[in-house]
């Protein structure tokens, strides 16, 4: 078994648990009339997991995949699971007000987003820039920096209107990256 096959398997298990959290909460989320913010978070997390799975294909393009690459991948996957678990816990059926729940856990959600983005920056600079090509720095300006800025704004400004705006921007950002990944049919994020 190649080293990247082990990494893909480990990431698949962790992201599979994150996906299970989303799927477990889905009926409770859609059978109740919930705040639209929680639907946006659900959509963003679905795209986050899909893009994370797809970009793992780039591991096969790395010539010198090492332990640090593996650790960064596990941190990214683990934080993604924490993000899904905080928003959609195992007791999702007992959540009475999704809006109250969102405002209870949203700081955890935004910190997890920041950690994922910073981990991705380290990973890109360490080794993935080889797989991404010479124009990889564009990814920072259209994807990662807006992601960090949105997350910082939402973390520090807890007003409902600010949360709305940031979640809409984050949803558009993720939708754009998912669409561009789909159109390119190559893992670029």
Residue ranges and their predicted role:
Residues 1-18, 185:
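Hydrophobic transmembrane alpha-helical segments in integral membrane proteins
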Residues 5-6, 62-79:
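Alpha-helical transmembrane segments
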Residues 41-47, 162-175:
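Central hydrophobic cores of alpha-helical transmembrane segments
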Residues 127-128, 176-189:
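Juxtamembrane boundary at the C-terminal end of a transmembrane helix
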Residues 37-60:
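A generic, lipid-embedded transmembrane alpha helix
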Residues 27-40, 61-65, 91-103, 154-166:
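Membrane-interface helix-boundary motifs at transmembrane edges
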Residues 74-143:
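Membrane-proximal helix-loop-helix units in multi-pass membrane proteins
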Residues 10-21, 74-87, 143-153:
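Hydrophobic cores of alpha-helical transmembrane segments in multi-pass inner/ER membrane proteins
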């Amino acid at each position: 078994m190649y080293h990247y096959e082990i990494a893909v398997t480990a990431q698949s298990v962790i992201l599979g648990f994150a996906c299970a959290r989303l799927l477990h909460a889905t009926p409770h989320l859609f059978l109740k009339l919930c705040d639209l913010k929680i639907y946006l978070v659900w959509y963003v997390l679905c795209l986050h997991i899909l893009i994370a799975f797809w970009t793992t294909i780039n591991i096969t393009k790395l010539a010198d995949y090492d332990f640090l690459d593996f650790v960064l991948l596990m941190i990214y996957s683990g934080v993604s699971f924490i993000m899904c678990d905080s928003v959609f816990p195992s007791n999702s059926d007992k959540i009475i007000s999704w809006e109250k729940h969102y405002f209870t856990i949203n700081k955890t959600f935004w910190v997890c987003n920041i950690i994922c983005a910073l981990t991705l920056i380290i990973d890109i600079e360490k080794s993935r820039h080889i797989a991404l090509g010479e124009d990889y720095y564009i990814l920072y300006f259209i994807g990662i920096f807006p992601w960090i800025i949105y997350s910082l704004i939402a973390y520090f400004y807890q007003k409902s209107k600010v949360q709305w705006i940031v979640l809409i921007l984050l949803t558009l950002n993720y939708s754009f990256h998912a669409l561009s990944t789909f159109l390119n049919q190559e893992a670029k994020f």
